[in-house]
């Protein structure tokens, strides 16, 4: 069974500062962590793997700072971690992110099951 999990890096909430000129989160001011809902998705995928066998592949989109969360997923028991990165994706909206992750699964698949968190704490759109 090929199980995929999408994870997102988010800023540590207690460290967030706002840029008062652009009214955006200053991500450079905060550490990062795996989105908690995505962490639960990884745990659920690993539970399914323990029952049915197969492999768990964790995917994220971002720069090298995302590698910490991917290593965390590997330490939890994921078999493979994939970071998709390209300067063209910098600042990508949720639709672009969803399309890129979908294309990655199609290339790596076939996918028998895909897990995601229900929403991220930093955007809460629940669209990817």
Where would I find each of the regions flagged by the language model?
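N-terminal glycine-rich FAD/FM-binding segment characteristic of electron-transfer flavoproteins
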Residues: 1-128
């Amino acid at each position: 069974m090929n199980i995929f999990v999408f994870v997102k890096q988010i800023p540590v909430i207690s460290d967030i500062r706002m840029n008062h000129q652009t009214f955006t989160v200053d991500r450079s001011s905060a550490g990062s962590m795996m989105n908690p809902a995505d962490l639960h998705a990884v745990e659920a995928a690993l539970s399914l793997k323990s029952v049915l066998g197969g492999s768990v592949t964790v995917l994220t989109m971002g720069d090298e700072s995302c590698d910490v969360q991917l290593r965390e997923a590997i330490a939890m028991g994921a078999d493979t971690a994939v970071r998709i990165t390209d300067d063209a994706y910098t600042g990508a909206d949720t639709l672009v992110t969803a399309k890129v992750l979908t294309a990655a699964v199609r290339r790596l698949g076939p996918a028998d099951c895909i897990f995601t968190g229900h929403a991220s704490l930093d955007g809460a759109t629940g669209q990817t």
